[in-house]
Amino acid sequence: MNSVDFVNSLKAANEPLFLASEMQVEAYFDSKPSKDKLVNHFIGRMVNERMNMVEISNQVANMPYDADPIEIQNISKQAFDEAVHFRLVKEVIEHITGEPLDVEAAIEAEAAKPTAKGAALLEKYEASTDELALALYQFIAEGRAERVWHKMADCIEDQFIANSYRKIGHDEGFHSNIGKMKLEKLCDSP
């Protein structure tokens, strides 16, 4: 089995995770959550997008001088995309509430919650410098994110929110492909 086939098999093996995630999103929105629950839910997503932006920007800043220029470009685009996603989700929250969001207070409140996710999980399991773990995480986590954002866009009746989330879902697919390309390259390396 070559690296492309191997990486494709990883995606196929994670299809149940992707489907379960879509089912959770659908069940959540079918439950008709209150405005407060929606806002809290989206604040978590907004903060996660900001955390991704910071972590990926740090990754770009610390790339070796001889790093592949295309990889630098792709990761830089991802950092930019995460900043856009942060703004889009902030705008969604303000659209729902009709009020400006106190971003600093929202981030502080979310940071006080004990849930470890994203980059914090990589640090917890001492994988934040492991190229293979990072590529695998990016491939699978961003692939899952693509499916989740698209499912939210499908479930949400408000077109302002749906269009914002469809854009985010599209970008997450690109981010997953960055991980896929890196993983294929690493799996070809001795």
Tell what function each PLM region has.
Residues 1-190:
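Non-heme di-metal
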